[in-house]
Every structure is written in C-alpha cells, then in structure tokens.
Amino acid sequence: MKSSVSIATRTPARTATAFAPLGLTLVLALAGCSGDGTTFGDTNGAPTTGVYVIQNTAPPASGSVAKASATTTAATGTILQFSTSASGAATPVSTIANLNVTSLAYLAVDGTGDIYTTATEGTTGTSVLEFPVNSSNNAQPTRAIPFNTTTQISVPNGLAVDAAGDLALPEANSGIAIFASTANGSVAPTDYIAGGGASTLVNPTAAAVDTDDNLYIVNSGEDVTNPIVVFNTTSTGAPIRSIGGALTAMTVGSPQAIATDAAGNLYVANVVSGVSSILIFEPTATGNTPPLRDITGSNTLLGCVGGIALDNEGYLYVVSVPTCGSTASPTVLKFSTTGDGNIAPVATFTSATWTNADPTLSIAVY
C-alpha cells in the first residue's frame, strides 16, 4: 500500500452502529437514484479539492413533523464537501447526497482524489464505496465491496486507503482486511492480518498507511501494551515495531484517529481523561519515544477530538466537539503541520448543514 494520507476514526464517547452482512443489494440501490426516484444530471460538478465530512440525518421523531408528511422520511447519510479555506460559519461547496442509504461511516481519499466511505442501507447491510473525484449530488460509486463472509468484513472500526486505492479495514475485536485497488464486489481480501497471536491485535480501532508501505494500526483492549503497532508488506503477521509508553503521552485507548504525511510522520488525535492533543511522531518512532511535537492547551480550542487528516499544503485538520460524549455540532480545526504546544488554529469552521456527524467524527482532505 502506498499513501501519504489515510483516515480512520473511532471515538469511545460515541458508539458506532454494528453493520450487518449483505450481498449486492446496496450496489444496485445506489445506481444513480435518490430514495424517492429522483435523478440529478450534475453528478460530477464538485471542486477537485476539499474537506469532506459526514452528515447523518435521523428520521423525524413522531409528532407534528412526521404527521404532516404523507410519506415516512427515512434516515439519510450525506457527504459534505467544504473548501480547504473554509472559515467561520461555512457552506458546503458540494454534497454527495440522495444515496438511498440510512447512514455513512468513515472517510478516506486516495492519490487521485477518489472518496471512500462505508454506507448502510436500512437493515439490508453495508458496503465500502468508492466515488470518483468531483462527485456531487447522487453520483454513482465506481466500486463497492459488501460486508459478508467472503470479504471477511463484518464490523469495521475504520478505513484506510493508500494512494493507489488499496484498502485496509480494521475489524472490531479481530484483524485487518486488505483489498487491492482492483477489488470490487463480493471478493476475498487480498491479504488478512489475523488478530491475536503474533500480530498482537486485540481490538484494532483505526488505521493509516504511509508512502513506505507501513500500515499503522491503533490497538486497544485487554493485555495491550503499546497502543500503536506497525506492519509492512513483508510482515508475516508480527508487527515490525510498536509505539507506546509514558513518554509518548498515549495510553491504551487514547488514540482516536491517525494519519501520515508525505515524509512519513505519524499524526495522532489523542484523548486522555477528556484532554485532547495532537501528537506528531517521526517516521521511525518506536517504543517509549516522545513525540516530535505536541499540540495541546486552551489556545488550541481542542475539545474532544475525533478524525484527523492532512492536505498537501502543510496543514492538518481535526474534528472536535466540546466535550467527549457531546451531541453538539462538530467543528473543524486547522493547524500548521509544524505547529507545537499551546497554539491557536489557523482557521476553524462549523456549518448549519453539519449538525450530526458520524459516530467517529470522520474527516478526509484532498
């Protein structure tokens, strides 16, 4: 796998929905139509670059709104795209919507700007979906990998994509399913790193890949010593190194999301006892080594952080809510990748159309 940026998140304060297996039902349902049969002509008019987040809208509660409608409004999942220069109260520059799905989780982009997410259609199941760069409205996915016994995906804890479009999905309380960029439909993983044993994986909760084929995994659960383990393509199941210890400022369960830059530096969105920080480690970091930089403090405006992503212009983006467990609307905080200590973000934005992020506060940037 080759990549400079990968995103996958899970925040303990919010519980993600467990996804059921399915066949190809979802793929057919997404063939260019909204839930009410409406089609849109402009499905590839979005800007090439942007900041992507998820808005999951629940159906209206029983009451006047629901009773006023002749039809039942279903829950919907939408990908919102904002400008990388967004600030303040922002308006999306584009959306991927009308997908006939009830919820979305996790976001990632590959080297060409294609967008990846997992989508749930009611009770029929879930797939990993890829949308072309510039997708908008009810754009059709170019590929979909369903969750079933063949793909060995059931309840993923995240999603990482490298520059070529290879996928890595950490499975809850299990291992890592890896798919080649050509994988499509109900196919077996190209490779699978099994949990337990030599891999030391207990409950992998996030993933990222770098340009040197290193696969970073956040590992949690009982008997886990170091919260980050690193594999590469020559691994036979055992990690090549791990990162953890008092000097790292991480504890088991504290990393919420991870990402890498083109130089191979590792960025960790970290929460310890409700206090958030962004930790940056050098590419060769191993064992109980301190981070190169640690962005934390009141000036940062970090509340309880979730997803993290990087652009190619020297900025990192993190999603934050006021406190862990908060249902308040999320905020994107933008920092320089060279920032350190108690610094203010260079920009922040919220949006009136982004009020209910996915449980993992996912974000992707291209």
Where on the chain are the PLM-derived regions?
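Bacterial N-terminal signal peptides that target proteins for export
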Residues: 3-22
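Flexible "stalk/tail and boundary" regions
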Residues: 35-366
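C-terminal motif of bacterial Sec signal peptides marking the signal peptidase cleavage site
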Residues: 28-32
